[in-house]
Amino acid sequence: MRSGVIAQKIGMTRVYNETGEHIPVTVLRMENCQVVAQRTEEKNGYTAVQLGVGLAKVKNTSKALRGHFAAASVEPKAKVAEFRVSPENLLDVGAEITADHFVPGQKVDVTGTSIGKGFQGVMKRHNFGGGRATHGNSVSHRTHGSTGQRQDPGKVFKGKKMAGHMGDRRVTTQNLEVVSTDTERGLILVRGAVPGSKGSWIMVRDAVKAPLPKEAPLPAAIRASNNNAEKAAATAAGEGAE
């Protein structure tokens, strides 16, 4: 089981495939998605990684969180979340996950907070048909009608669909297709709609109901540090000289 990522919802647009068909996509952006802490079986009783994304002002970060980020040698993060992983896919603290963590064609599950709609009636909230428009109906055109039966059972059952607060809930949409990724800009293009408003934080994970593609990097797609890049460049230069 691999780690997921935290991304920010930018909005929706459309792209075209090789045959000229347009595909509606949601654009998600990863901004400095780094491992902030580890959770191990020996110390915590489970295995997970804590990721942080975005940048937060130091003055708006609590003293406890400043110490937490300093221990990981990362800048203060705007959003922090944990992802359960298998022991072999545990990531080092400070590692940065890139957008090519997911591959085109892969299925993912996305989790976000749906847009709040406030108090709504049953026609909008539950897609009820409403009452009659004429023939004796007055002031009851959009009501839900009866909510119970008679003296027995003499109550309204729990879960009855009625008017109430709509939206602003944690929603997970499963099996969305990754259309493409842009590592340089940290973009993930996902087919279809993603719950949440523009600017909201979205958790993106490997789909639990679809197999992981063989091309998916394990344990994750990690951005090479400057030191590693310099070593790789020096090695390549040495091989070229030989």
Swiss-Prot record:
Methylated by PrmB. SUPFAM superfamilies: Translation proteins (SSF50447). The keyword NAD does not apply. Residues 131-165 are annotated as: Disordered. GO terms for molecular function: rRNA binding; structural constituent of ribosome. GO terms for cellular component: cytosolic large ribosomal subunit. GO terms for biological process: translation. Residues 135-150 have a biased composition (Polar residues). InterPro entries: Ribosomal_uL3 (IPR000597), Ribosomal_uL3_bac/org-type (IPR019927), Ribosomal_uL3_CS (IPR019926), Transl_B-barrel_sf (IPR009000). The modification N5-methylglutamine is found at Q151. Transmembrane segments: none annotated. Keywords: Methylation, Ribonucleoprotein, Ribosomal protein, RNA-binding, rRNA-binding. Pfam families: Ribosomal_L3. PANTHER family: 50S RIBOSOMAL PROTEIN L3 (PTHR11229), LARGE RIBOSOMAL SUBUNIT PROTEIN UL3C (PTHR11229:SF16). Belongs to the universal ribosomal protein uL3 family. One of the primary rRNA binding proteins, it binds directly near the 3'-end of the 23S rRNA, where it nucleates assembly of the 50S subunit. Part of the 50S ribosomal subunit. Forms a cluster with proteins L14 and L19. This is Large ribosomal subunit protein uL3. It comes from Chelativorans sp. (strain BNC1).
